[in-house]
């Protein structure tokens, strides 16, 4: 399974923040090949996960990855558009690592367009859909490019945690990890660097130690 370091960091951070309990439910919007769902399932033994993916090839790959894992009974992969997804379930947690690119970078491949770009689901629509699917006491976890910081602050209310991510300690921020809900809360801001002097930082290693064998 092809993975990105920032996605792994996001999955590990979200897994550490989620408070699971018997029959707690999580929705993974745009699961791709299932990475985040598998990471959450590994760290939260009581949670049940619905992983939704619009692109058929990715959904099939996610289902295969889940079936070959020990978490097959905990993760349900759904090949559907989140905009037409109907569920009687209100989720305790929602997690999303949405597409990062704008229309200026559209691919000629329609499937890749859908999976990798924002033409299908903008941030405001994503937030509104999530509010309808999340319990009043629930939390939403989101990974976004840092260049969209102003849009994030404008569109999202009640952010409780915000982690700004640098690829290297001497580089600018390039990602931002957010936790928010419908509850009023005080914002806790922090930052993390993935690497320093060419090596993974201790903060990164601590978060990823249960997922990276080398740590």
Where are these regions (language model features)?
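A general structural signal for well-ordered alpha-helical segments in protein cores
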Residues: 7, 11, 33, 37, ...
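Mobile active-site "lid"/loop adjacent to the S-adenosyl-L-methionine
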Residues: 98-125
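Conserved SAM-binding loop and adjacent beta-strand
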Residues: 1-16
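Conserved SAM/SAH cofactor-binding pocket of Class I
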Residues: 12-89, 93-96, 102-107
């Amino acid at each position: 399974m092809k993975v990105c370091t920032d996605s792994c960091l996001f999955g590990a951070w979200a897994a550490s923040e989620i408070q699971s309990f018997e029959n707690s439910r999580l929705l993974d919007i745009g699961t791709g090949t299932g990475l985040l769902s598998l990471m959450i399932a590994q760290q939260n033994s009581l949670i049940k996960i619905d992983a939704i993916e619009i692109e058929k090839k990715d959904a099939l790959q996610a289902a295969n990855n889940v079936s070959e894992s020990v978490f097959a009974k905990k993760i349900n992969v759904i090949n559907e558009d989140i905009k037409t997804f109907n569920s009687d379930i209100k989720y305790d947690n929602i997690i999303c690592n949405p597409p990062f690119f704008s229309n200026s970078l559209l691919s000629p491949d329609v499937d890749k367009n859908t999976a990798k770009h924002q033409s299908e689901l903008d941030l405001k629509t994503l937030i509104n859909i999530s509010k309808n699917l999340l319990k009043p006491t629930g939390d939403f976890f989101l990974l976004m490019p840092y260049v969209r910081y102003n849009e994030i602050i404008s569109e999202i209310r009640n952010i409780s945690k915000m982690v700004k991510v640098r690829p290297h300690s001497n580089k600018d921020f390039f990602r931002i990890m957010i936790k928010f809900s419908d509850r009023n809360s005080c914002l806790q801001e922090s930052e993390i660097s993935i690497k320093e002097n060419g090596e993974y930082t201790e903060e990164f290693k601590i978060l990823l130690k249960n997922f990276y064998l080398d740590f």
